[in-house]
Amino acid sequence: MTKENLENELKTLPNSAGVYQYFNQEGKLLYVGKAKNLKNRVKSYFAFTPNLHANPRNSLRIQKMIEETVHLEFITTNSEADALILENSFIKQLHPKYNILLRDDKTYPYIYVDFEEEFPRFEITRKLVKKSKIKYFGPFFKGARELLDALYLYYPLKQKASCKSPCIFYQISRCLAPCDKRISREKYLEILDEAMHALLNPSILIKNLEKQMLVLAQNENYEEAAKVRDQIVTIKDLEVKVEIDIAKLEDFEVFALAFENSMLSTLRFVVQNGKIISVNSKITPIKNDIQWDKNEIYKQLILENFSMDIPLLANVIYVYEEFEDRMLLEEILSQRFDKKISIKIPKIGEKRRICDLAFQNALLNIEKEQKNHDFTIQKELKSYFELENLPNDIEIFDNSHLQGVANVGAMVTYSANSWDKSKYRKFHLKHKNDYDQMREVLMRRALDFDKIPPPDLWLIDGGKALLDLAKEIIVSSGANVDILAISKEKIDAKAHRAKGGARDKIHSLKGEFSLSINDKKLQFLQKLRDEAHRFAISFHQNTKKKQDLNSSKLVNLGLSSGVIQKLLAYYGNFESIYKADFKDLAMLVGKKVAQKIKEN
């Protein structure tokens, strides 16, 4: 592909809304953008005389990107709003080199009350509850469970979803037995109203907890006192000290961005009844050679936090500063929720002051991050191995099996200088050799990029063959992910382990590297590999125990080892065997054997 081909492709652009994609010489996706008019928007990136080149009026980031571009593709849409939604989906799924990806795929809990119930109670949800008389509080970015426990401790509300007679909570004076009509609905709702007020004012709960902690300590019940102390610390963290009087009991949200020293900080305030009830902040390292795009960040931030499957608590959003697609986002959100949603930039007054406060906190978070986290090793890896991304988010893969038995794969995740165990993954595998097993694991992960965004780096436990395999899968996915592999040094075709430290080689797309065993880069990659290995081995051992147990059950039914292996080869695992359709089993191993399996 050449610049001449690109010039011809530019001539095919239509005058309609859509999404455009830029690719480099290797076919790697560089950038995804949206346009109201594809022809006008894409051509604005280029100058055409004397030859096709980057438009010097654009930023250095854009010029650098265009110099790398040799091919473009586009998808037309019915409207610019549709194009924006598709653009956001592509960025999240494919992680293009010149787009910034906010890595926050978590859903946060809400506390809610269902007033359709005769005696409503507090519950936790992460999704929209499809009922008409629901009151939501949140989202709570931490501490939701601690808040709920404190509410039930001090307000004698119904705790069990279904209860027909007084339960243990009534006996210990933690419930007034509404199930047995020992309290009227009117009186019960008065108590509930007090509890909801406390939920919006955590200092009320903290005072009660501090009294309880003191009593426990005086009674020398130090273990329980320590638990209450931890609960107090968590709830105190929820409180935001704001010297701004939000006079009206309003519900709204505030978003602010800050960028400094290659760090992007995003901050979100959730305000209910005039109180800031929760704060969420996120730090994203940005590649040094790429300038940040506030319009792109605000779009991602707001679209992700106002998705259709979570409750809408506020129809007004305040942002610290203007951004290009603000009005378009208003249109999208208003259509999404079938009501008017406003995105505003306040100029004066309390709303302006709270937006300024959000921005100041975003800057402070960058300072804290730089003091608490050292990204030196990531920068060294990027420079030494010529990676495209700063490897802040790393996924590490390993497989484990014993002579083709209990075949499993594992993925561990290292993010922002710590293990992110919420993103660890386990895989039951069908194949028996290392190469096909790794293909199976990597393919399954790549197919999930639309749900869990790709990382900056894949680290594979293996040699060049597995590195090339990973490259093939990443290229086919269209995602922008660097790849490294780590393998034992081989002597006479056998992996060599030196006493006092394994001799490891690092494989990259640029070549093979032998680093000193004292090299910090090698030690860091070994640490990552060892955690993946530990996780895979542990999963393999547990799987093997379960398989041995299940195998003994089938042996007790009179099945031979040959029949059991035949079933496993076909179904992959014992759970699938037990769930299999009788007809399918009968065709595979005969009716008598199938009947034994289904009856037991």
Swiss-Prot record:
Pfam families according to UniProt: GIY-YIG (PF01541), UVR (PF02151), UvrC_RNaseH (PF22920), UvrC_RNaseH_dom (PF08459)
Transmembrane segments: none
Highest taxon listed in the record's lineage: Bacteria
InterPro entries: GIY-YIG_endonuc, GIY-YIG_endonuc_sf, GIY-YIG_UvrC_Cho, RuvA_2-like, UVR_dom, UVR_dom_sf, UvrABC_protein_C, UvrC
Keywords recorded for this protein, A-Z: Cytoplasm, DNA damage, DNA excision, DNA repair, Excision nuclease, SOS response
Domain UVR: 203-238
GO aspect biological process, one term: SOS response
Record-level Gene Ontology MF annotations: DNA binding; excinuclease ABC activity
Gene Ontology annotations for the cellular component aspect, listed alphabetically: cytoplasm; excinuclease repair complex
KW Transmembrane helix (keyword) present: no
Localization per record: Cytoplasm
GIY-YIG domain location: 15-100
HAMAP family noted in UniProt: UvrC (MF_00203)
Similarity-based family: Belongs to the UvrC family.
Subunit comment: Interacts with UvrB in an incision complex.
Biological role: The UvrABC repair system catalyzes the recognition and processing of DNA lesions. UvrC both incises the 5' and 3' sides of the lesion. The N-terminal half is responsible for the 3' incision and the C-terminal half is responsible for the 5' incision.
Record protein name field: UvrABC system protein C
Encoding gene (name): uvrC
